[in-house]
Amino acid sequence: MDLKSHDTADFRLVYRDAGPVSLLLDKAGVKPWFDGEHTVLKQGGKVEARLLRTPSGTVFVKHYLAKGVLRRLLAWVGVFRAQRMFRVSAALQDIGVRVPRPLAFLVEHRRDCSSSFFVCEALDAEDLKSVAVNRGLDAIGGAFRLFDEVSNTLVRLHGAGYVHGDTKWANWMVTRGEPQLVLIDLD
């Protein structure tokens, strides 16, 4: 994987392609980039997920706050959730597991709280639970095809030493057009 990095006094950025993070490379700072035009998908005390519109299109960004003692200690020694997500996503793609393409991760260093950001492709998809409830499984090839694909994916995942930890219908996305299953929420 061809990666580039960009370091400032405030953050370290590792990326594949400059488009989604061009504002950071242009010295806009983390806050203006993350607070750009966006849609909040999930907001909590430790994690926030957004669809962020960038000059190269919409991307999915998950912001991890290292607030607790353990997370702060791990951040202090250089272990960040976004970096782990980036590496796991790339490794899973390498073994044929469909996951959103990882684009970048950013590690921000602040006195009050270290945080990290995972950036990946935004999917044109809906979650499997919604598909099953609203349109039925026949709309995506039927139950047999679905369970065959899910089981084969989980075999590849487990065969490579990975466990999802939260495998549920809502963590499988079904792409629009030619329906394909994509596994999400890998953390």
Locate predicted features:
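Catalytic activation segment of kinase domains across protein kinase-like and atypical kinase folds
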Residues: 170-187
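Conserved short alpha-helix within the protein kinase catalytic core
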Residues: 140, 144-151
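Conserved ATP-binding subdomain of kinase catalytic cores across diverse folds
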Residues: 26-128, 149, 155, 159-160
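Catalytic-loop of the protein kinase fold
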Residues: 159-169
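AlphaC helix of the protein kinase catalytic domain
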Residues: 128-138
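Active-site flanking residues adjacent to catalytic metal/cofactor-binding acidic residues
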Residues: 61, 165, 184-186
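A short beta-strand motif that forms part of the nucleic acid-binding face
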Residues: 65, 135, 187
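Juxta-kinase regulatory segment immediately upstream of eukaryotic protein kinase catalytic domains
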Residues: 1-39
